[in-house]
Amino acid sequence: RAANAYQFAYDSYMLVKAAKEAWDSGLLVHGLLQFLNTPPYIEFARYLGSDASITHTAAQCTRYRPGQYLMPHEDLDENEGRRYAMVINLSRDWRPDWGGQLQFLDGDGSVVETFLPRWNSLSLFRVPQRHQVTLVAPWAAQPRHAITGWWLAR
């Protein structure tokens, strides 16, 4: 199906849904979502993004295993009010030949920029912007882990 239409294959843990439905309350990652929505952090997001309309953050935990990917898309969601997308990379010692790279595309679909998912790095970009995560190679020795989210305005 991916040859003819937008597709993705990766594992996710939806932090906002988990918080609303009280899943796994003991997981430390729930504290991260709370932090990403504190007034000081939202002020930081507004400052960094030069966007006073940012009101909150939505996030998910993502894991890309060998053979998984995210096809080109723009993260546009009018109902959520996405302003910026963010990726907090959590994979140690990631190698370029393992794939899983965040790539930005121009209007013709050509790659114009590529970012390796380096440990403890933040990728932040304005939405909409065409991008993809390349296929994680079958020989990748570990999954690609990240916290992926959006700065929202409502």
Where do the protein language model's features map onto the residues?
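Generic ordered-secondary-structure signal
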Residues: 1-10, 44, 53, 94, ...
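Generic serine detector
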Residues: 12, 25, 50-53, 91, ...
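Short, conserved, surface-exposed binding loops centered on an aromatic residue
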Residues: 34, 47-53, 75-80, 94
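Catalytic cores of PAPS-dependent sulfotransferases
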Residues: 37-50, 64-68, 92
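Short coil/loop residues immediately preceding or within conserved phosphate-binding loops
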Residues: 56
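Catalytic core of Fe(II)/2-oxoglutarate
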Residues: 59-154
